[in-house]
């Protein structure tokens, strides 16, 4: 729920029509690998329990020895990537605390990309709250 790996989004070129370069960099840290391994181990334990007997076949992938490589190569987010335009006052932030993109006059970002860290729950309520707060401070 709280990955420590960090990816990046960079511009391919100055043409706004061209898609950006997106590097998710999933499971790049030892901590993320460990958490994924623990989750898969728990799922395996549950599926091996009496409650599931007769409902499952033998495990096909990844096999006990290949778990880390499987997680590194196949693990990804189900949905809700966020944090690509981090909000903050530090030099690495993309926007200020009002969602204004640093160095681009007149452009604001108000979505889940502002979150420096993902929340434990659904992002919808947090994004609505950010949008309400930022829009309340805007003047027409």
Predicted regions and their residues:
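FAD-dependent oxidoreductase catalytic-site/capping-region signature
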Residues: 1-126, 134-140
